């Protein structure tokens, strides 16, 4: 299975953050029951629990600005690892928060789903 992992990562990242920024409730289609999210130190498993966590975040408006995106194949089966860094603009805040996020995408038929998702805010030392 030959995958253009760079294009896949770019397309996935654009879709994911556009969806997150406009309507987080719709992100459930990207996860499965075996999917896991580590959000800061909280670990959740399953699409339902993951979306509940994302929807419960304490802000109304959010915008992700990507500064770096790296991807590489993760297995001979077509899995792809995606690492993103960027800025998070929350509500009307003028100072963005830095973040890092890693996705492990697994093939499913002709598409992919998020098997692992690790999110971390990056605070200055």
From Swiss-Prot:
Transport as UniProt keyword: yes
SUPFAM superfamilies according to UniProt: NTF2-like
Family matches, as Pfam families: NTF2
Alphabetical list of InterPro entries matching this protein: NTF2, NTF2-like_dom_sf, NTF2_dom, Nuclear_transport_factor_2_euk
Annotated PROSITE patterns: NTF2_DOMAIN
GO CC entries: cytoplasm
GO biological process: nucleocytoplasmic transport; protein transport
Cell compartments where the protein resides: Cytoplasm
Keywords: Cytoplasm, Protein transport, Transport
Signal peptide bounds: none
Domain NTF2: 8-121
Function: Facilitates protein transport into the nucleus. Could be part of a multicomponent system of cytosolic factors that assemble at the pore complex during nuclear import.
PANTHER family, A to Z: NUCLEAR TRANSPORT FACTOR 2
UniProt-recorded name of the protein: Nuclear transport factor 2
Organism: Kluyveromyces lactis (strain ATCC 8585 / CBS 2359 / DSM 70799 / NBRC 1267 / NRRL Y-1140 / WM37)
């Amino acid at each position: 299975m030959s995958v253009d992992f760079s294009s896949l990562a770019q397309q996935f990242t654009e879709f994911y953050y556009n969806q997150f920024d406009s309507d987080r409730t719709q992100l459930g289609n990207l996860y499965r029951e075996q999917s896991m999210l580590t959000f800061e130190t909280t670990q959740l498993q399953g699409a339902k629990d993951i979306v509940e966590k994302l929807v419960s975040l304490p802000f109304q408006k959010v915008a992700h600005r990507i500064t770096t995106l790296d991807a590489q194949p993760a297995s001979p089966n077509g899995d792809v690892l995606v690492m993103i860094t960027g800025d998070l603009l929350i509500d009307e805040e003028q100072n963005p928060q830095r973040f890092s996020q890693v996705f492990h995408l697994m093939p499913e038929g002709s598409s992919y789903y998020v098997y692992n998702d690790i999110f971390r805010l990056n605070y200055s030392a």
